[in-house]
């Protein structure tokens, strides 16, 4: 009845583009039945949805992170079931979470755990020879409790400043590399973020804004939205090996790495200086060489966006104001002037030689730059 109602309200063509996930985290207490009873639920749900809308996309099982044995076995057994029973499965979903902690009075992120969850999940999918099926990481986050503020868990203070966006940049690069390694079809990863109304400013909930003030992490997603075309290869002398990050995180040297895309008229390079530890660290000089530009492009326009302590960051300004919980209209206006995605410098034209350009910048600890090159 639900699917039929949705079709009636929104139209079959629209609803056919949606992804129906049958349950949430049935491997833990959100599901009170046995795994076999979940298989039956899934089978009946697929039949019901498809009866109301032939061609609808239905999938799952939206388990917790497969880095844990129980979740690993549930996902593995579910894929065995749908194969043996020949039940339709249009996409595979599971969750991946990091594990931030307080160490020595400072937040230390747990990137290794999130990437390990994904590594194990992709391994299961590949072993079942379901490489072409879309995979949706329907929750991919630095930890598991969106509604736990830093008053509940002090480690969740990471959500306010530059640690969150730089973590997300490094994590997403790892997710794509793992998809390449296992030769699976990663369709999307979702940030399980919400709106929390009536709460303090920068209370540390997993949200993209706080009382109408955008957080730096939202500017990471704004940066990512500006990257067009296809992913292209990147190498960095400062990047850490993926296997080392999965094994032990980013605990010693920082991860100075990048992600790039290109289309017929633009190239974009996102680069970051990431470390699991919140505590202050050194800046990193970065020299970026972009090759493969059209030989006819003798001059290109560089637009340089930045997230750091003084750009695209209302949190540091709010702290400088004395962390007001009842900011004045003037203070709110000033915070809004800093909460959007900001340029590090005015756009400028630079010379390209032989289809290549070189750009130098300095990346502060936990900073992210987006270099957008148009021709």
Residue ranges: model-predicted function:
Residues 182-188, 192, 197-198, 206-266, ...:
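Glycan-recognition and catalytic regions of carbohydrate-active enzymes
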Residues 139, 193, 236, 271-273, ...:
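Active-site proximal loops enriched in glycine and acidic residues that flank catalytic Cys/His/Asp
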Residues 1-30, 62-69:
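Active-site mouth of glycoside hydrolases
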Residues 244-322, 360-370:
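Carbohydrate-binding surface patches
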Residues 149-161, 170-195, 294-345:
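Substrate-binding clefts and catalytic carboxylate motifs of secreted carbohydrate-active enzymes
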Residues 326-375:
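C-terminal beta-strand-rich structural cap/linker in extracellular carbohydrate-active enzymes
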């Amino acid at each position: 009845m639900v699917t039929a109602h949705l079709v009636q309200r929104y139209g079959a063509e629209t609803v056919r583009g949606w992804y129906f996930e049958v349950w949430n985290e049935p491997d833990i207490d959100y599901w009170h039945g046995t795994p076999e009873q979940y298989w039956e639920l899934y089978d009946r749900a697929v039949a019901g949805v498809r009866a109301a809308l032939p061609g609808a996309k239905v999938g799952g099982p939206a388990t917790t992170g497969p880095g844990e044995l129980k979740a690993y076995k549930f996902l593995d057994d579910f894929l065995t079931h749908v194969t043996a029973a020949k039940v339709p499965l249009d996409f595979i979903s599971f969750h991946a979470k990091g594990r931030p902690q307080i160490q020595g009075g400072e937040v230390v992120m747990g990137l290794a755990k999130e990437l390990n969850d994904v590594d194990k999940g992709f391994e299961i999918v590949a072993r079942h020879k379901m490489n072409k099926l879309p995979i949706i990481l329907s929750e991919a986050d630095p930890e598991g409790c969106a509604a736990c503020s830093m008053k509940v868990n002090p480690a969740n203070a990471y959500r306010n400043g530059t640690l969150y966006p730089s973590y997300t940049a490094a994590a997403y690069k790892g997710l794509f590399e793992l998809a390449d390694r296992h030769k699976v079809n990663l369709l999307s990863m979702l940030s399980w973020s919400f709106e929390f109304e009536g709460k303090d400013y920068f209370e540390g909930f997993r949200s993209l804004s706080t009382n109408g003030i955008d957080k730096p992490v939202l500017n990471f997603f704004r940066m990512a939205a500006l990257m067009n075309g296809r992913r292209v290869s990147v190498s960095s002398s400062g990047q850490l090996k993926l296997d080392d990050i999965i094994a032990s995180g980013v605990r010693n040297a920082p991860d100075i790495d990048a992600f790039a895309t290109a289309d017929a008229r633009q190239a974009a390079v996102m680069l970051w200086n990431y470390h699991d530890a919140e505590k202050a660290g050194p800046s990193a000089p970065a020299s970026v060489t972009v090759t493969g530009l059209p030989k006819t492009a003798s001059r290109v326009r560089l637009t340089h966006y930045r997230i750091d302590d003084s750009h695209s960051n209302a949190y540091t300004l709010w702290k400088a104001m004395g962390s007001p919980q009842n900011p004045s209209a003037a203070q709110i206006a000033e915070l809004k002037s800093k909460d959007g995605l900001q340029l590090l410098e005015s756009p400028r034209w630079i010379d390209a030689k032989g289809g290549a350009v070189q750009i130098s910048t300095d990346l502060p600890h936990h900073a992210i730059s987006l270099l957008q090159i148009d021709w």
